[in-house]
Amino acid sequence: MCHDVEGRFLHEPTVAALEAAADAAEADGIAAVFVTTGPLGDAVTLAAGLSATTSTILLGIRTNLSTEPHRHPTVLAREMTTFDLISGGRSLLAFTPPFSDAVIEAIELCRAMWREGVAASDGPNYPVAGAINRPQPRRPGGPPIAVDLTDGTQADPLLIAVADLLLVSTDSPAPDGLAGLELCRIRPT
């Protein structure tokens, strides 16, 4: 999917500029673009809008659980399911630093929602009982989950073990010990 190919983070000042940047990235053969919740609004909503103006590029959401505490992982999983359906299965979900046990717990809850359609946890960070996710994502098992290491952060091996892919900067070598894990190199902006 993203093995040693280029992706881009989009930090555009307007929705029109964001759409133009995504269209240009797709035309240039870039594998993926990523948006973050910020001044333009919610990243999932923005990416869903970008899916209407693009057709092949993967559309990634970057989320930071420490700065978005209102977004419970079961809510995020449902939002990502809807986005995956709207985008035709072109969605990605990337978790950004700081990393903690809460991120692993969030990934486990998202995956349960996507794979079983229901999630329950008595974990310390996100206790929940009977959260339901219907319909299921277009992509079996749900969107791929990335760990964003583009700032040079070292991730816990347990976190790397639950990720589908890693986002690393083109400025730095790939971390050691990642056999079998997909890498998506991101050009710094």
Predicted regions and their residues:
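Active-site-adjacent structural elements that line small-molecule/cofactor binding pockets in enzymes
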Residues: 1-189
